[in-house]
Amino acid sequence: AANHSLSDIIAVKSKPIAALMMLQLPFSNIDINSRDLEQVLCGAKEIFDRHNCIINGGHTMIGKDSDPVIGFTVTGESKLKENKNKKSYKIKNNDILVLTEKIGSGIIFSGINNDMIDSYFQKDVITQMTNGNFLFGNISEKLNILSMTDITGFGLVNHLLNLIKRDKNKTGLTIFPEKIPIFNGVKEAIDKGVKSSLFESNYNTAINSIIYDRQKKSIDEILYDPQTVGGLAFIVPKEEKEKQYAILKKHKINFFEIGYVNNLNNQIKIM
C-alpha cells in the first residue's frame, strides 16, 4: 500500500514529502490489534524512509472485515524546474510508448486465492511490489517524458486511455500485447479461466475505446487486469528514444517498448 500510493507522486515527477496512514484492522483483542498496528507501521516506515518521506499522522479503526484495510495519502513536491530555454515537445504520431514493469498481479493473486495456480507464482509479484518505482523516481527528471501514468487498479488500457485523453492533439495509441511483459503464471491462470475481481468493470469501462486489428485472444485479458504497485507507462519522442533508453539502462531500470502514438482520437488499437 505504501509503494502503491507513492506511484502517483512518482508519475508526476515529484518527490514525496509526507504521508498520512489510514488503517482498519479486524476486530480482535487489544494486544493483537496493537501488534498488527506495529507491524504495519514498521513495514510502511521502511518503504517511506527510502524516499525520505515522513509518516506524520493518520487514523486507525476497527472494522468487521476479516482482512486489514490500509491506504496512504501522500503529499509531494515537484522536482521540475522551469527552463525557458528548454526545447518544448508535443506528442505526435509515432512517438514511443514505454512500460517499466510486468503486469498480471491481479490475475496471479486471484488464481492463488481460488486454488487454481501454485502460490509459487506470487514470488516475483511480491518482489516487484516491494521494490516499487523507487529507482525510476530517483531519475525521472532526467528523462524527456511527454506524458506519464502509473499502472494500478484500472488496468493497463484504462490508464493508457487516461494518458492520451490529456493530450489536446486528440491522439491515440497502437499497442502490441505480445510485447507487454507479464508475470510467470499469468498465461496458466488465464488458460484456467482466472479473472480478477475488477476485470469486468475495467473491461466495460474501456471496451468502447478499443479497436482490435485482429481476432481477440485470451492473453488480451491482461490489458484489463488491475495492478497493485504496477510500473509506469510513458511516451517519449521517437527521435530521442535511444537517448532516453541509455539513461534507463545506465540506472538499471526495466523498460519495454510496447507501442506508439497514432492519430486515432482517444482510442487504442490492439495489434
Regions found by a protein language model. Give the residues of each.
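Aromatic/hydrophobic pocket-lining residues that form the small-molecule binding cavity
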Residues: A2, L37, L41, M129
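Fold-independent oxyanion-binding glycine-rich loops
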Residues: A1, C53, G58-T60, F72-S78, ...
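Glycine-rich anion-binding loops of enzyme active sites
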Residues: K15-I117, Y260
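Glycine-/charge-enriched secondary-structure boundary and capping motifs
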Residues: S28-I54, M61-I70, K142, G153-M271
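Adenine-nucleotide phosphate-binding core of ATP-dependent small-molecule kinases
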Residues: S119-I126, L146, L198-N202
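Short, compositionally biased
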Residues: F109-V125, H251-N254
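Active-site glycine-rich loop that binds ribose-phosphate moieties when present
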Residues: F72-N85, Y120-E141, Q215
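Active-site cofactor/substrate anionic-group-binding motifs, chiefly glycine-
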Residues: A1-P16
